[in-house]
Regions:
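Conserved phosphate- and dinucleotide-binding cores of soluble alpha/beta proteins
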Residues: 1-88
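Intrinsic disorder at enzyme termini
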Residues: 83-99
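Long, contiguous binding/interaction regions
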Residues: 94-289
Length: 289
């Protein structure tokens, strides 16, 4: 009673062929209707399928297929119209369960922070549409009504090396809700990463932005990233306070209508802080991010 159908299988057969297929072949046995399956589990991760769109199901299954077969499966899915023609796979690595973290926010809510996946695009759009117009403007520096699919993929379909993205989610895995997003994009010339955040309105002021930044820093420092770079509108005081809480040496400058904040991590040099202008004092109020 109340059980959930779960399919567990190795990603390949004994002779190396993919067990994840774009279509069932003649003679393939079916033990359960495909529409009823909740989870498919391989050694490369867990795909949750129940209630998802065809695009989301196809991407989730490709993500848990053997890396050797993913490009072929993606091309087949594109040919069948299951996914967009411009869909790509930024990473061939398995989803890293070891990079998941559970944190308790100031309001007592428990939130999981996990690596983003290509199949998260639809849920990220949902987070975007919950943001206020001002949140959107201070995040993207322009008025945006909706994120294009390529924009969404930039925020979740990453290689986890020079492009990194973490999501904050609540609820059970089969019905999780994205309440926050943090990502960075590394410059190979400076070894500094530009960072960006989105936090759902109901979680602003609860410390989620700080928790996401801490997780992003932990990941970056483990990969010898030199530091973070923030590009912030002066009126975005919440983000200025969040940047001031970054680890290491903090320096700021202003160019036209943008405040540039650089945080050099302690393992890349001095760990002292240069003072921010009074209006950017991190103790001036609570962090809304």
């Amino acid at each position: 009673q109340d059980g959930k159908p779960i399919v567990c299988l190795s990603s390949t057969t004994d002779d190396g062929r993919s067990r994840i297929k774009p279509l069932l072949e003649a003679g393939d046995g079916v033990g359960i209707a495909r529409s009823d399956v909740h989870y498919v589990i391989t050694e490369y991760g867990i795909a949750y399928l129940f209630g998802k769109s065809i695009r989301e199901r196809a991407l989730a299954l490709i993500e848990v297929a053997h890396p050797r077969w993913r490009e072929e499966l993606l091309k087949a899915a594109q040919k069948l119209g299951y996914v967009r023609a411009d869909q790509y796979l930024a990473s061939q690595a398995a989803y890293s369960v070891h990079d998941e973290r559970i944190v308790t926010l100031k309001n007592g809510t428990k939130v999981m922070m996990r690596p983003a996946r290509a199949s998260d695009a639809g849920a990220l759009q949902g987070l975007f549409h919950r943001l206020s117009e001002d949140d959107i403007y201070t995040r993207f520096f322009r008025r945006v009504r909706s994120l294009s699919y390529p924009d969404l993929q930039t925020l979740c379909n990453v290689n986890h090396e020079t492009e990194v993205a973490f999501l904050a989610v609540t609820g059970p895995r089969e019905n999780e809700e994205i309440v926050g997003s943090a990502c960075y994009f590394l410059s190979p010339t400076t070894n500094l990463a530009e960072v960006a955040f989105m936090v759902a309105p109901e979680f602003q002021g609860a410390g989620l932005g700080t928790a996401l930044q801490t997780r992003l820093q932990e990941y970056a420092m483990s990969r010898n990233v030199r530091g973070f770079v923030f590009e912030i509108l002066p009126r975005n005081t919440s983000m200025l306070r969040l940047a001031a809480r970054a680890q290491g040496t903090i320096t700021t400058s202003r160019d036209d209508d943008v405040v540039h904040v650089t945080a050099l991590f302690a393992n890349s040099g001095s760990a002292s802080r240069s003072p921010l202008p009074e209006s950017q004092d991190p103790q001036a109020g609570e962090v809304a991010a």
